[in-house]
Amino acid sequence: MRSRCSWYPAHTMIAAVPPEVLSETERSLQTFGRVVLCQIVRAEGSTPGKVGWKLLARPDGSFVGNLGGGAFEALVKADALEKIRLGAGVDASEIKRYYLTEEATRGEPTGMVCGGMAEVFLEVMIAAPVLAICGGGPVGQALARAAAMAGFEVLVADDRPEFRNPELFPAGTHLTVVNRDYEEDFLSPLRHRDLYVAVVSRCWETDTAALAAILRQLRQAPESSLRYLGLMGSRRKIARVKDELAARGVDLSILGDVQLHAPIGLPIGGDSPGEIAISILAEVIGKRYEKSAVKS
């Protein structure tokens, strides 16, 4: 049976965007970190949908909105999900042309005989990267301010009441209360986002607890998009933390291709909280864009 086609000429008024598509786009970005918004931007001849119709594709295979249904919409959905599967960046956004004939796009017969053509803008949308900071002391505060200016969404986890004050951090910072052992699942709401983690807590015991908690949460959520993990401290302190993790049976190999940057930051000199924060953020940004600086 051939797919049904509605006739919408090219000059048809742009259709209103369903409000659920707009509201779900922001919500889905926060939940999944990456979506593809598909919009018909041009139509010629008979097409299933109007110019302006939108469809939101999400990593779990679900969709919001529609482009008119049928084999045409199925092809667009498949293309959108493929971009998500490949982890495409915003530069992979494109306008793609679909011919609504029996010998359709990519040579796949659709059963459609509309004879029209539709161009669809497949817009890859990625949520702001997240920098999770374990430790809300002077370095953590300076790092939060710098990261917010660089476009990161910031989360700060600390067990000390005096460092849970929103006035110490930039607006919009997620302040998470943890105990000294970091037993709370503080990364769970962000595990689908591009995630960067800096451990800059007050002592080797809390550093160890934070790292153990991060590795535990990664083991429980293998789909996590961890891009960077760094630990502040001297080489002696770092060695002690690693020894303690080994004694607890915590295996760093769960990080896979993610390197533990320890000591954290680029060796640019300076030891004030602000200077340390800049060195950390420089390393994080370098990792984000796959750029490296030579370390001594």
Where are these regions (language model features)?
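Basic polycationic patches enriched in arginine
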Residues: R2-R4
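Short glycine-rich anion-binding loops that position phosphate/pyrophosphate groups of nucleotides
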Residues: A43, R202-E205, S234-K237
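Small/polar loops that bind or transfer phosphate-bearing groups
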Residues: G68, G135, V199-R202, L229-G233
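Alpha-helix termini
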Residues: G87-A88, Q217-S224, G249-L252
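Adenosine-phosphate binding glycine-rich loop
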Residues: M232-S296
